[in-house]
Amino acid sequence: MEVGFKALLDDLDVLEKSLSDPALINKLRSHVENLATLSKCNPHRRSKVKELSSEVVDSNPYSRLMALQRMGIVDNYERIREFSVAIVGIGGVGSVAAEMLTRCGIGRLLLYDYDTVELANMNRLFFRPDQVGMTKTDAAVQTLAEINPDVVLESFTMNITTVQGFETFTSSLTNKSFCPSKEGGSGVDLVLSCVDNYEARMAVNQACNELRQTWMESGVSEDAVSGHIQLLVPGETACFACAPPLVVASGIDERTLKREGVCAASLPTTMGVVAGLLVQNSLKFLLNFGEVSPYLGYNSLKDFFPTMKMRPNPQCSNVACLERQKEYMLAKPERDAAAKAKMEADASTTIDEGPLHDDNEWNISVVDDENEKDTTKAASSSDTLPEGLTRELPVADEYEKAIAIASGSGETEEEDDLEDLKKQLEALNAA
């Protein structure tokens, strides 16, 4: 297209020289230059893909992802288009997590943030300088739609810690328009918390406890050299209020802790690692492969990845969390019975193993070790030869027997030895 615009401009130059009044030509040239600029600003977008294909061609954006299914890692990767994921906080971690899920072909993304893109955000990933001044949600939708038009994107520019924002947040999570057949009170499959303050985390925690919604929490330290992710299942694992940070437990307003002129450090590397761990565990949770980490830390100074499990606190200050704990304990006998039945079913299932190789070119057979020993013993004890074969020399036993008979010292020598021993014993006793 750029070549065509350049040729058109060249033609206008030639035409300008042949006309006495070049004003009209200059006007046309201005229009062409504007069109050329617009064509550069609006890159080509691919068409939507109706069905995922594993065909390995350059034009298939999902061929590398579908290879996970072909290699046995995932049973059915196409299910990813049925899932909805909500991301709260489109900052250094949340924006990268949103991009990763978009490239993986997630079905629907719900994006929540109230901040705008600034030049100070350019040290991080995802956002571009030409998006400065836009809300982070609008900028994210713009970029993600260009990356993968198959993903349904819904943005909410609001603060979820306000009363109105919290109500909008919970109502959007319960919207099942994307998947009406989804069970439970929530319309999303997973909530990812990528916020940078405890107040917003507590708001997400409250909403997920009320809706019985599984969610994952993530964060990066103020010095930008460590981070963590955590899986939170209401009633089964500790919620964010079960073991709150000191700032939350003491009731201090965290806004008073921020010093004027001092900002937290930010490294795109640390945020990229945390976002990768977050999305990796999200995919394992959604597509049911591997093991989801209940808590995974990251210390970049020592490349240390601590893991742990956090049980719910029976004395948690969150009322909704206590209710979920009671529900989980009441359902425990049913879960144990189901697990026992599954274990028995797996144990009773016998797999008929066929031959490792159908063809046996060299007629190799497997012989039992015990039978092989018996066969060897029987063969060694038998002195019979096949018909038509004779021994040139006698066997060792026959040879020794013949020498003993010839010398006449067979049994006589043994008797003499016994007599000598008897006399020696009598002499010892007499002494």
Curated annotation (Swiss-Prot):
GO molecular function: ATP binding; metal ion binding; ubiquitin-like modifier activating enzyme activity
InterPro entries linked to this entry: D-isomer_DH_CS1, ThiF/MoeB/HesA, ThiF_NAD_FAD-bd, Ubiquitin-activating_enz
Region of interest (Disordered), ranges: 339-396
Annotated function: E1-like enzyme which activates UFM1.
Protein name: Ubiquitin-like modifier-activating enzyme 5
Binding sites annotated in the UniProt record for Zn(2+): C239, C242, C316, C321
Domain of life: Eukaryota
Keywords attached to this entry: ATP-binding, Metal-binding, Nucleotide-binding, Ubl conjugation pathway, Zinc
Listed SUPFAM superfamilies: Activating enzymes of the ubiquitin-like proteins
Pfam families assigned to the protein according to its UniProt record, in alphabetical order: ThiF
Family: Belongs to the ubiquitin-activating E1 family. UBA5 subfamily.
Active site per database record: C263 (glycyl thioester intermediate)
Keyword Manganese: no
Binding site for ATP: G92, D113, K136, N159, N197
